[in-house]
Design a protein with these regions (language model features):
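Acidic, serine/threonine- and glycine-rich low-complexity intrinsically disordered segments
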Residues: 160-330
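An anionic, turn-rich surface loop/hairpin at beta-sheet edges
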Residues: 102-125, 227-237, 368-405
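Sec-dependent signal peptide recognition
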Residues: 2-7
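C-terminal motif of bacterial Sec signal peptides marking the signal peptidase cleavage site
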Residues: 12-15
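N-terminal glycine/threonine-rich, aromatic-flanked beta-hairpin/loop signature
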Residues: 56-98, 190-226, 299-372
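Acidic/polar, low-complexity intrinsically disordered N-terminal segments immediately downstream
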Residues: 18-108, 134-138, 142-150, 159-184, ...
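Surface-exposed, polar helix/loop patches in the mature regions of secreted/periplasmic/lumenal proteins
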Residues: 93-137, 256-260, 266-277
């Protein structure tokens, strides 16, 4: 009996020891904390959070959050174009480490796992999004990000009603860079020096200049994009780039003390058009011509040009586009089409042209239409073709208003294999580019 009593006593001591250790590791079981909830619900329009890493490993993601006293949080972010907030649950718990805010269920902030790439994505995938409350700084709430384990701070700033209405514009300004980074370049120029153009990478909203050590986290703004910290370019400190009104795809630009930084889109490397192929106009070629059926699937034909200029509908394309030069000044932009039972006919507008800045400029057109077969083009059953031809003529002229770059390509296109092939790209709207035969003199 004595041995049994001693054994039971030993077991009892063992269990007590294990429980004591658990108490040290987690001295306070998680309980709802009304004090933190009170802080979170105090801002009438909620809070805004710029989620960005302190080491430029991922850039700025904008979130708006409005908490209620029933444990619900409504969110909006620049991760999507929607203007409709989404609602999920949250908790404010008192733990051994302090007051913890936990986001429950799926909401805007959980989309970070899909938006981020690499190690940053792994750190945000399949996790409970938790922030440790560390106190107030003025009107702001300060937290430690428990996801990352690097003591990174996140700041909740009081939001305004205007913040909620402008969030879709933030998405609109950042998404072109995210989706087409491979075609964006950063040009840094001064009033006197030769511009320097950098290919870029834009991953996790971090702008990196290729072949350099320069990188900076980026966040969307209502005007364009901003840098998380001052970014030195051309010896000057830049804090933001504004989106140039009307630029498609967007151009982002700023000038500081005579140094201009410009993020611009190009379907080909910027030096692609550095040659003098534009000088072939009126020296070795008298114009350009393409037939849609032979060029629409060419690798150099951009979707924007085909859809907006050449395509009539799902089954019909305009047959031909020509740009013909008459001497050193005059130009004729022509659309040719083959009409059933009526044959081939041309509709054209005339204008002036000029060669400068390595571009072909089209100018001074009255946009008056001329044709030798007005009855054919005016036939009611050809209405869709006429309307598209008019749009095409106007579009080509407008694309040339700020100049068309010209590059002679090392390819042949049947059935005119003997004709040189050129690539023309709009300077103002670089999404509009098209291959075309040169018509030899």
């Amino acid at each position: 009996m004595k041995k049994i009593t001693l054994l039971l006593l030993a077991m009892s001591l063992s269990f007590c020891t294990k429980n004591d250790n658990d108490a040290v590791d987690n001295p306070i079981d998680p309980v709802e904390n009304p004090a933190l909830m009170k802080e979170l619900t105090a801002s009438p329009d909620g809070w805004k959070l710029t989620y960005v890493s302190p080491d430029d490993s991922f850039g700025g993601y904008n979130f708006l959050m409005k908490f209620d006293t029933q444990g619900k949080v409504t969110m909006l972010s620049d991760l999507s174009a929607t203007a409709t907030p989404t609602t999920s649950s949250y908790r404010t718990q008192e733990e051994g480490r302090g007051l913890v805010l936990s986001f429950i269920d799926n909401n805007q902030i959980h989309r970070l796992a899909d938006a981020l790439q690499g190690a940053a994505s792994i750190a945000h995938t399949g996790k409970v999004y938790q922030f440790l409350y560390t106190g107030k700084e003025g009107n702001n709430l300060k937290f430690q990000n428990l996801l990352l384990g690097n003591n990174a701070s996140v700041i909740f700033e009081p939001a305004t009603a205007a913040d909620w209405s402008r969030t879709p514009a933030l998405y609109k300004n950042i998404t072109p860079l995210t989706n087409a980074a491979a075609h964006y370049y950063l040009k840094v120029s001064t009033a006197t020096g030769t511009p320097t153009t950098y290919p870029i990478e834009f991953t996790n909203r971090v702008l990196s200049l290729k072949n350099t050590q320069s990188k900076v986290a980026v966040l969307a703004t209502e005007k364009g994009i901003a840098f998380h910290r001052a970014f030195t370019l051309g010896g000057q400190s830049f804090t933001e780039l504004e989106r140039v009104a009307g630029s498609v795809p967007p151009v982002y630009k700023a000038t500081v003390n005579g140094v201009t930084a410009e993020l611009f889109y190009s379907s080909v490397p910027p030096n692609f058009f550095d040659g003098d192929d534009y000088k072939d106009v009126n020296t070795s070629i008298e114009g350009f011509a393409l037939m849609s059926q032979y060029f629409k699937n060419n690798e150099y034909m951009t979707e924007a040009f085909y859809e907006d200029v050449l395509k009539v509908d799902a089954s019909t394309d305009l047959f031909m586009l020509k740009i013909m030069f008459d001497g050193t000044d005059d130009c004729h932009i022509q659309i040719g089409h083959i009409f059933p039972e009526k044959g081939f006919s041309i509709l054209q507008i005339s204008c002036k042209y000029e060669l400068k800045n390595k571009r072909l400029y089209l100018k001074e057109s009255d946009k008056n239409l001329s044709t030798s077969a007005p009855d054919v083009w005016g036939d009611e059953k050809n209405k869709a073709i006429l309307e598209q031809a008019q749009r095409a003529l106007g579009s080509v002229y407008d694309l040339g208003a700020q100049g068309l770059y010209i590059k002679k390509l090392n390819i042949k296109v049947k059935p005119q294999e003997d004709n040189p092939v050129y690539l023309l790209q709009s300077y103002e709207f670089p999404l509009y580019a098209f291959p075309i035969w040169g018509v030899p003199l």
